[in-house]
């Protein structure tokens, strides 16, 4: 679930040695599954452990995760690096804003997850977004674009060379292509 690098483990052991005995760390997500999701690490004294917490044992300490954060911390990585500028603890949780779906989840859920996790972060740089409207019986993902994507002169490139190509590769045999259901209106909001 969570990978903690050797350097980060040593850092936590050092910090925890200055705390009350039995204190561990807690890894959590505030506002999980939303665009405002934020991850954190805090001390977890023995009296703060909840009955439904998940305990991840490491050498010298445990990482406690509350049940609500579990799915959002899948594939999370914690590292501690030191360079000439100082030291830094980093926590990367690629599923904090959107819970990872199982490989055998329904096709709609897998395509939706791909769009939210991979495509929308890139489109957001242009003020754009896309949502999955439906998957047709003949295997086409129907998308609706908004924000900077609406009316953008590059939308065909984004759809055909970007999203469609990746979806066909990732979901071979299940997705045949992508259709754009957006009524594009060029305006000041359009990126290109």
Swiss-Prot record:
GO biological process: iron-sulfur cluster assembly; protein maturation
Keyword Nucleotide-binding: no
PANTHER family listed in its UniProt record: FE_S BIOGENESIS PROTEIN NFUA, IRON-SULFUR CLUSTER SCAFFOLD PROTEIN NFU-RELATED
Key word Membrane present: no
InterPro entries xref list: Fe/S_biogenesis_protein_NfuA (IPR017726), FeS_biogenesis (IPR000361), FSCA_dom_sf (IPR034904), HesB-like_dom_sf (IPR035903), NIF_FeS_clus_asmbl_NifU_C (IPR001075)
Record-given protein name: Fe/S biogenesis protein NfuA
Xref: Pfam families: Fe-S_biosyn, NifU
A GO molecular-function descriptor: iron ion binding
Cofactor(s) this protein requires: [4Fe-4S] cluster
């Amino acid at each position: 679930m969570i990978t903690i690098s050797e350097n980060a483990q040593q850092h936590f052991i050092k910090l925890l040695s200055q705390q009350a005995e039995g204190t561990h760390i807690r890894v959590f997500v505030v506002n999980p599954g939303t665009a405002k999701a934020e991850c954190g690490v805090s001390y977890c004294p023995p009296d703060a452990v909840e009955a439904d917490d998940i305990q991840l044992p490491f050498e010298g300490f445990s990482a406690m995760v509350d049940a609500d954060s579990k799915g959002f911390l899948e594939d999370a990585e914690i590292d501690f690096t030191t360079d000439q500028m100082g030291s830094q603890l980093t926590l990367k949780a690629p599923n904090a804003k959107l819970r990872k779906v199982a490989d055998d989840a329904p096709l709609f859920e897998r395509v939706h997850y791909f769009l939210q996790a991979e495509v929308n972060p890139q489109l957001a740089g242009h003020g754009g977004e896309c949502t999955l409207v439906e998957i047709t019986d003949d295997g086409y993902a129907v998308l609706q674009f908004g924000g900077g994507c609406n009316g953008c002169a590059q939308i065909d490139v984004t759809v055909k060379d970007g999203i469609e190509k990746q979806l066909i590769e990732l979901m071979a045999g299940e997705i045949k292509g992508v259709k754009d259901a957006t009524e594009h209106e060029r305006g000041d909001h359009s990126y290109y």
